[in-house]
Amino acid sequence: MGRIIRNTISYGFVTLILAALGFCIYLFLDDLDGPEVTMAPDTGRISPTQEITLKLADAKSGVRSVVVTIHRNNQSLVILDKVFSEPAPVQTTSFNLKNAGLRDGAFELEITARDNSLMSFGKGNGTTRKWNMQLDTQPPK
């Protein structure tokens, strides 16, 4: 009789461990996609004082952070590095290039957003989008 109880407890414990393992695997594999990133205006030309608005969306786990980087002439400059206090399915944020110290001409704008999933050892899924932009500091004549 003691052996039956011991075996039942052992099987119950193994079942509990397997269920917990299955749940952990589900959590890791439930959200494999990074956030959607949209930018407005998306014209390719911009002035330093023009506000650029980002809309970041991740319905499953919410948006955790965004980093905006400018690449020009083999140099990189981070314009915005923001971690949202509360991950939400949709986040919006704005920035401009007023304090970037850029001159007229072409540059690449890179936006990387991360969600609040457990992927990448807790860093979340990431999405990186790049736009070729043209900075125009001269007012229209």
Which residue stretches match the model-derived regions?
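Short, solvent-exposed loop/turn segments at the edges of extracellular beta-sandwich modules
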Residues: R114-K123
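Surface-exposed, short loops/turns at beta-strand junctions within beta-sandwich domains
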Residues: N99-A106
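Contiguous beta-strand segments within globular domains
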Residues: D42-K55, V63-S65
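N-terminal Sec-pathway targeting helices
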Residues: G2-I17
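Aromatic sugar-binding surface patches on proteins
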Residues: S85-N96
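Solvent-exposed loop/turn segments flanking beta-strands in beta-repeat/beta-sandwich domains
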Residues: D58-N73
